[in-house]
């Protein structure tokens, strides 16, 4: 009986500990739910803090009448619209809603609140400085092909700060009626973090990494690309016949048939393991932003499914931000870090609010493999399929 009581007490303690852990690390997600009645209540009593870019350009602020206002430039408002969000919380992943824990003063200490009450001062939320650059975001928006949908992510690979995260189409947060009337266009969705797409040839980075990690004697690798590779009842095709080429040549030419053949040597277990080490099938719980989970099929794939997955097709899905993280990992010598969107949080009194520490970087591939991939990716841009981007 005493043993049973002890076990029940221990289980109860574990539940309480997990609850406290969840509130501390993920409480911001609960606060950020646009249906949380505490948000609307808090807005009635708290002056919402200011959002700025990394250089201090004001992106959103609260005026003297308590109304949420946005940057005076329509071009700027649209360039950062999905990152900043809107006053009504229609873009629930935007900073105005997702970081309500700071902007609406949920993180204010009891002493700060008592000081406001004692002086009769209306409580003011924290100011949040984001890592993005308004100028860079606006430049990307101006260069983006008109009428096209897509996303662009720019990361500082050393710090994993998000310097720009632009999604098309866009909306103006000062005219939400128009945005909601055209909601089917998808402007309220941040395609960089919420859009799940077949990564295509960018996934060849993962396949190449898996091959370099697991297959021997790749220095002598040669494959004769005839323009198609029969596998099962299907053929993986290429735009042209590349002829006999090394692995480096195949990567530079983005040769589908070579990577389809590599997949058969790797098998679904080895390729799937590398994909998962690089974040596929992971439940992303980042501190600064919501990112939808990428997926790679890990069940017993058929030969043709495996071949298509090796070139980023089939059932492989990823967000643009995740693929940018993978590229950043290569530049960072094989270590993947959590993306950062918050640069600083400042209290109403001018002090720095303590932020949750970001998860430490984890090694996903060896440094030697990362260095080799970096060289190969540079070659792609200098003389391969990426040359037009140079």
Where in the sequence are the language-model features?
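Periplasmic/cell-envelope proteins involved in peptidoglycan metabolism and beta-lactam response
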Residues: 1-180, 187, 196, 221, ...
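Beta-lactam-recognizing serine transpeptidase/beta-lactamase-like catalytic domain environment
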Residues: 55, 115-116, 158-201, 206-390
């Amino acid at each position: 009986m005493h043993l049973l009581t002890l076990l029940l007490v221990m289980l109860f303690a574990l539940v309480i500990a997990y609850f406290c852990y969840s509130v501390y690390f993920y409480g911001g997600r609960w606060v950020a739910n646009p249906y949380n009645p505490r948000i609307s209540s808090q807005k009635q009593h708290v002056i919402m803090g200011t959002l700025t870019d990394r250089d201090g350009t004001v992106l959103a602020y609260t005026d003297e009448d308590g109304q949420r206002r946005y940057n005076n430039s329509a071009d700027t408002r649209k360039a950062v619209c999905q990152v900043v969000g809107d006053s009504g919380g229609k873009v629930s992943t935007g900073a105005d809603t997702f970081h309500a824990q700071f902007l609406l003063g949920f993180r204010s200490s009891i002493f700060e609140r008592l000081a406001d009450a004692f002086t009769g001062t209306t409580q003011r939320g924290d100011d949040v400085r984001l890592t993005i650059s308004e100028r860079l975001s606006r430049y990307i928006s101006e260069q983006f092909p008109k009428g096209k949908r897509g996303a662009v992510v720019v990361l500082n690979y050393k710090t994993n700060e998000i310097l720009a995260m632009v999604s098309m189409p866009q909306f103006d947060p000062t005219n939400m009626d128009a945005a909601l009337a055209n909601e089917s266009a998808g402007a309220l969705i941040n395609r960089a973090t919420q859009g799940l797409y077949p990564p295509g040839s960018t996934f060849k980075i993962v396949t190449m990494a898996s091959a370099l990690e697991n297959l021997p004697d790749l220095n002598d690798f040669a494959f004769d690309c005839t323009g198609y590779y029969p596998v099962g009842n299907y053929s993986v095709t290429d735009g042209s016949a590349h002829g006999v080429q090394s692995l480096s040549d195949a990567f530079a030419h983005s040769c589908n048939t070579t990577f389809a053949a590599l997949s058969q040597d790797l098998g679904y277990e080895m390729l799937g393991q590398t994909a998962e080490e690089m974040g596929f099938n992971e439940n992303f719980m980042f501190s600064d932003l919501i990112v939808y989970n990428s997926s790679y099929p890990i069940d017993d794939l058929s030969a043709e499914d495996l071949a298509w997955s090796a070139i980023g097709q089939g059932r492989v899905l990823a967000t643009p931000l995740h693929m940018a993280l993978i590229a950043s990992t290569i530049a960072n010598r094989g270590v993947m870090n959590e993306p950062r969107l918050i640069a600083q949080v400042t209290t109403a009194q001018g002090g720095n609010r303590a932020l949750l520490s970001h998860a430490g970087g984890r090694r996903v591939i060896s440094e030697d493999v990362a260095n080799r991939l970096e060289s190969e990716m540079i070659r792609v841009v200098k003389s391969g399929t990426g040359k037009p981007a140079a």
